[in-house]
Amino acid sequence: MRFTARERAGIVVGAVLGTDCALHLFWATTGSSWPATTEESLSRGLLNADFAFTPRVLYPLAAILLAATLMVLTRSGLFPWLAARVPGWLPTLVTIGVSAAVLIRAIAGIVWITGIDSSAATWFYRLNLLLYTPACLAMFAGCIAVLRSHCNQNA
């Protein structure tokens, strides 16, 4: 099967969002701090701060990530069955929201890379430099590709 550029961009963004959703569900259901050894080191590595990774926090985040995944894939033209069941503006609005969120995170990541409020000796700094910020920039580009391409949506 050949995918259009819009569909490929949606698949990439959806894969990242879906993987993030799966990780949140894993942490919520198992209580594991994988891939870190402790919840504190997980929080520090992911967020550069101490936050509790409790089901009360993780389940709502997983639900938001799942909804975002479905809407981006729908806006990409990959889920026509879902496009027929939601207002046509909803996948577009959610994709705009995802693009804004990842752009803001990418800008924050660039600030942290400069050393503002982040130490180069931490795992967070290295992960932010090599993974988080590049992934957010790629997701932003993917969202723009999804949004720029014409996609028939049911109104």
Q: What kind of feature is each model-predicted range?
A:
Residues 107-119:
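Transmembrane alpha-helical segments of integral membrane proteins
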Residues 3, 23-58, 79-84, 116, ...:
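Interfacial loop at the N-terminal end of multi-pass membrane proteins
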Residues 50-75:
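Short, well-structured hydrophobic secondary-structure segments
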Residues 60-69, 131-146:
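Hydrophobic cores of alpha-helical transmembrane segments in multi-pass inner/ER membrane proteins
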Residues 95-110:
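Hydrophobic alpha-helical membrane segments
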Residues 90-97, 122-139:
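Individual transmembrane alpha-helices with interfacial aromatic-anchor signatures
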Residues 2-5, 71-96, 154-155:
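Cytoplasmic juxtamembrane regions at transmembrane-helix boundaries
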Residues 10-29:
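N-terminal signal-anchor transmembrane alpha helix
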